[in-house]
Regions:
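Hydrophobic alpha-helical membrane segments
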Residues: 86-100
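Core segments of alpha-helical transmembrane spans in multipass integral membrane proteins
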Residues: 16, 20, 24-32, 45-73, ...
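Membrane-water interface at the C-terminal end of transmembrane alpha helices
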Residues: 122-139
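Interfacial segments of alpha-helical transmembrane regions
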Residues: 6-19, 81-89
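Membrane-helix boundary connector in multi-pass membrane proteins
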Residues: 100-115, 134
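Non-cytosolic membrane-interface motifs at loop->transmembrane helix junctions
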Residues: 40-47, 80-82, 108-119
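Interfacial loop at the N-terminal end of multi-pass membrane proteins
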Residues: 2-11, 29-54, 74-78
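Juxtamembrane helix-break-helix junctions at the cytosolic face
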Residues: 2-4, 66-84, 107
Length: 139
């Protein structure tokens, strides 16, 4: 598999995971009692402030999905200009790599079991899309 196709596959995997996270966050925002798997896992039903934060996070994760797809070479809209795609995707890679460590350190067994592997695969997928994907000079 050449790097262009690998980048497209990595961007697609990352986007799929991001959309899954967005759906999870949207469900939390709507009141689904999955709080034990989010925001530190301290309570099943999260409060109003965290529900609002989950709603905002859902929107952000949709943007991250679009960025991953575009950086992977797909012809789709992204919330950043093409010249910023690679740096943005590298930044998102670092952010999700930090998320791996934070989820691994969580006191919530549910967060550790669910989000540690999810963020690990997401970080690797974003990293591959960033490294092998669209170049600013070729966009």
């Amino acid at each position: 598999m050449d790097r262009r196709r690998a980048a497209a596959a990595a961007g697609t995997v990352a986007a799929g995971l991001c959309l899954g996270v967005a759906a999870f966050q949207a469900a939390l925002a709507l009141g689904v009692p999955w709080g034990e798997a989010a925001w530190g896992g301290q309570q099943a039903q999260i409060g109003t402030g965290l529900r609002a934060a989950s709603g905002a996070a859902a929107v952000v994760w949709v943007g991250v999905a679009a960025t991953a797809l575009r950086q992977g070479g797909r012809d789709t809209w992204a919330p950043v200009p093409d010249r910023w795609l690679r740096p943005a995707t590298l930044g998102l890679t670092a952010y999700t790599a930090l998320g791996v460590a934070l989820n691994l350190a969580s006191s919530s067994a549910v967060e550790r079991a669910l989000w540690t592997p999810t963020t690990l695969v997401l970080a690797v997928s974003l990293g591959l899309a960033a490294t092998w994907g669209r170049r600013a000079d070729a966009a």
